[in-house]
Amino acid sequence: SLEQKYNAVCFDIDGTLTKKNSKEIDERVIKMIADLLKQKIPIVFITGRGSTGLNHLLNDIQFKLLNLYNVNNNELKRIYALANDGARLFYTSNDKIFNECIYTITDDKLYELKKFDEEIIKMKNKKIDDICKIAYSKDAVNNKILNVRFVLQDDKDDNVKIVMDFIKNVINDYNLNGLSITRGKYKESSVIQVGTTSKDIAIETAERLVGVPKNSMMRIGDCGDKIGNDYAMLN
C-alpha cells in the first residue's frame, strides 16, 4: 500500500535503476540513494549481476555519493548487494563499497551447478547450440560457476520451450533439484538462467541481513512475469 511505511529498500539494478537500453545508473537514482542513506534507511541491491557488474555500478555511484551528495563512510555501510540473484553477499566495512564478500549458498548447490554444466557440455546438443549461446557468471577469485545462462537468439515460444525442456530434463535426470531456473535479460537478449538461488530466496536473506521483515521492505524490480527473475521484487 502507498500509505505503508517501509524500513528498508531492495532494488533490482538492470532495467530498474539504469538508463533506457543502458547499463549506466540514472543520475536521479544516485540522489535518491543518497537521500535514503541520509535517512538511515538500509539499501540492498538484489541483482543477477556478478562482481564485474557490481564494479560497473560502483563506477557510476560511488564518487558522486561521496563527493556530490556528501555521504559519509558510516552511511555507506548501509549499502549491501546480493549478487548472482543472492548467491553472494557484498558488504562494506571501510570507505570502499562492497570490499567484503561471502557466499550465502552451500557447497552442495555449487557442486550441482558444476555437474549441470559438465552434463550439458557432454551432450553437445546441436538443436540447443543452433538457437542459443551459453554464457557464464563465475567467481573471479576461484573460478566457481555461479550462473549458467542460455542466451536465446530470438523470443520465439517454440525455441523458449525447447531450451526450457532441455534444462528441466537435465535437472531431473541427474537429481539436481537444488538449482533454480529464471528468465530475464542479459546484454539486451532474452535469457534462461540456471543458478543456485533466486530473488525470492535472496529477499529472505536480506530480511535476516538488515533485521527488517520482508513486508516492511520496499522491493522494486522491473518484471511482472511470474517466471521472470524479478517477480519476487514486486511488493
Task: For the regions a language model picked out, list residue spans one by one.
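Phosphate/oxyanion-binding active-site loops and adjacent basic polyanion-contact surfaces
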Residues: 21-25, 50-54, 194-202
